[in-house]
Amino acid sequence: MAIIFAEVDDLGTYSKDQSYLQKHIQEVLNLDLVAVDAIRNANFKVVVDGVNSTGGIFIPALLKELNVECIELYCTPNGQFPHNPEPLKEHLTDISGLVVKEHADFGIVVDPDVDRLALVCEGGY
């Protein structure tokens, strides 16, 4: 069996389609377990630490669709992690302080690929 190497420019194609974000948000809102009306009427204020990754795109967009006031912390998706990106207690000092300072209802911290999260309660812990 021969191994064929390809130059990086010959590895395939990709496409940009901004509609997928909205499609994904709509799928989440359509889930029976999401109490959309209750959330929209609750006047929540939430701090989001997107660790400068994809979570900084999706989580604020989802919360805004739910009429949640979203305070963004590290939500520029540039890949420059402002702290260790593992959503563990010892990495939550920035968001903990901001949740308290902003009198937020809670905070959401995600890891870079948004498959794990940590929640910070209104007291910052």
Please place each PLM-identified region on the residue numbering.
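Gly/Ser/Thr-enriched, mixed-charge loops and adjacent short helices
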Residues: 1-102
